[in-house]
Amino acid sequence: MTQATPQRIAIAGASGRMGQMLIEAVLDTEGVELAVALDRAGSPSIGQDAGAALGRPCGVTITDQLDALAQADCLIDFTRPEGTLQHLQACLRHDVKMVIGTTGFDSSGRAEIKVAAQKIAIVFAPNMSVGVNATLKLLDMAARILNSGYDVEIFEAHHRNKVDAPSGTALIMGETVASAWDVALPDVATWTRHGDTGVRKPGTIGFSVVRGGDIVGDHTVFFCGTGERIEISHRSSSRATYAQGAVRAARFLARQDNGLYDMQAVLGL
């Protein structure tokens, strides 16, 4: 009996915190192998072994050459929107599938990903955590039940270095509630409050943001009624959960044709 060929994985942002966790997750997962490690041009990590900083040399050298993706089956990318879109074009050139965990895209960037998914298979999700995606299912259920007489507020907290707000996870939570209410999030979202705001408008969804320290990611959705309050929370204590979910998404794509998928599809939820 012949052994199946491992899925060849590429990691973008290989020297960063998330990139290193992704590399470790790939090294720890059966059925996949690290084939390419990408980093930005000028990075001091170029030319180094991708696993050296983990104490696990793996024989894959970090490079800034996007054409190295020709040696991969799937790219996992948790970088910045502008970098991810460059990587997307390289994946299209080399017919490489893609897992995108990057957040902060504008409507144009999201549209570009959607168009690309007509030619390659893509998992695009703001949060790869299994727990977060289970939380989204709970939110959908709660929002369908608590659709009248309850005010919804979404609180999120992240580390001081996160550059986009609200987080992608908070936004998808808001979209989940809005969808259950059969409305569009932009039509009901309240992004900021300051000064004399007047009374709260029924049917709106408020957002609150904290940035500080090394908070990995906290999210709570409040359903506030008269005489009671329901809170649905998820707290991440390690980025490892995102890395493990991303590798799981890559394994899912190995069996998929072209198209745009989310983590709900990956997990069969």
Swiss-Prot record:
Residues binding NADP(+): 40
Pathway the protein acts in: Amino-acid biosynthesis; L-lysine biosynthesis via DAP pathway; (S)-tetrahydrodipicolinate from L-aspartate: step 4/4
Reactions catalysed: (S)-2,3,4,5-tetrahydrodipicolinate + NAD(+) + H2O = (2S,4S)-4-hydroxy-2,3,4,5-tetrahydrodipicolinate + NADH + H(+); (S)-2,3,4,5-tetrahydrodipicolinate + NADP(+) + H2O = (2S,4S)-4-hydroxy-2,3,4,5-tetrahydrodipicolinate + NADPH + H(+)
CDD domains (UniProt xref): DHDPR_N
InterPro entries: DapB_C (IPR022663), DapB_N (IPR000846), DapB_N_CS (IPR022664), DHDPR_bac (IPR023940), NAD(P)-bd_dom_sf (IPR036291)
Keyword annotations of the record: Amino-acid biosynthesis, Cytoplasm, Diaminopimelate biosynthesis, Lysine biosynthesis, NAD, NADP, Oxidoreductase
Binding site for NAD(+): 13-18, 39, 101-103, 125-128
Main location: cytoplasm
Similarity remark: Belongs to the DapB family.
SUPFAM superfamilies linked: Glyceraldehyde-3-phosphate dehydrogenase-like, C-terminal domain (SSF55347), NAD(P)-binding Rossmann-fold domains (SSF51735)
Protein task: Catalyzes the conversion of 4-hydroxy-tetrahydrodipicolinate (HTPA) to tetrahydrodipicolinate.
Positions contributing to (S)-2,3,4,5-tetrahydrodipicolinate binding: 159, 168-169
Active site: 158, 162
Record-given protein name: 4-hydroxy-tetrahydrodipicolinate reductase
Record organism: Bordetella pertussis (strain Tohama I / ATCC BAA-589 / NCTC 13251)
Molecular function terms from GO: 4-hydroxy-tetrahydrodipicolinate reductase; NAD binding; NADP binding; oxidoreductase activity, acting on CH or CH2 groups, NAD or NADP as acceptor
E.C. designation(s): 1.17.1.8
Gene3D superfamilies according to UniProt: Dihydrodipicolinate Reductase, domain 2 (3.30.360.10), NAD(P)-binding Rossmann-like Domain (3.40.50.720)
GO biological process terms held by the UniProt record: diaminopimelate biosynthetic process; lysine biosynthetic process via diaminopimelate
Cross-referenced PROSITE patterns: DAPB (PS01298)
